[in-house]
């Protein structure tokens, strides 16, 4: 009887050739940023603090560099728009708009981090965190102690960001899963402009 080892070895080699390994997560982050001048995606968000969970969902749109629209549709309506200079936060239920300089708020929003060309690399030290399931993960730790997020994890597949996990200075753990992503589709400039509706309170967050 012939030994099975050569056959098993050949099968393993063939399997490896048929399913090449993904690039590292850091390399995929760079490819994701450089390869998507615009991005639109649905998202589902879960925030956990001391055992309590809050879930929300909505839509993200990005136009690099620096413009984004992060819109919550469930369970409440909230709109966050970065027009490149000013960050606008519109709480419809409160009839209130908060306005602040976008540059000062880059570290406080996942969308702001994603909309820049290299904001994450500029503000965080990146390390490979290995593969879990079918995602390659990186771990990002802040270079400065006053950053809003104390830790960020990002999971990629085929140069596309699938999931973010963030821990902030208040002890909140946030998990964001992206779906229905479209890269480099035309997005109207009006999507990244905001004018406070009549009758709402406008406060400065600077």
UniProtKB/Swiss-Prot annotation:
Pfam assignment, any one: LolA
Disulfide topology: none
GO biological process, one term: lipoprotein localization to outer membrane
GO cellular component, one term: periplasmic space
Signal peptide: 1-23
Predominant location category: periplasm
Keywords: Chaperone, Periplasm, Protein transport, Signal, Transport
Cellular compartments annotated: Periplasm
Tree of life domain: Bacteria
Function: Participates in the translocation of lipoproteins from the inner membrane to the outer membrane. Only forms a complex with a lipoprotein if the residue after the N-terminal Cys is not an aspartate (The Asp acts as a targeting signal to indicate that the lipoprotein should stay in the inner membrane).
Family statement: Belongs to the LolA family.
Subunit organization: Monomer.
Protein name in UniProt: Outer-membrane lipoprotein carrier protein
Organism: Chromobacterium violaceum (strain ATCC 12472 / DSM 30191 / JCM 1249 / CCUG 213 / NBRC 12614 / NCIMB 9131 / NCTC 9757 / MK)
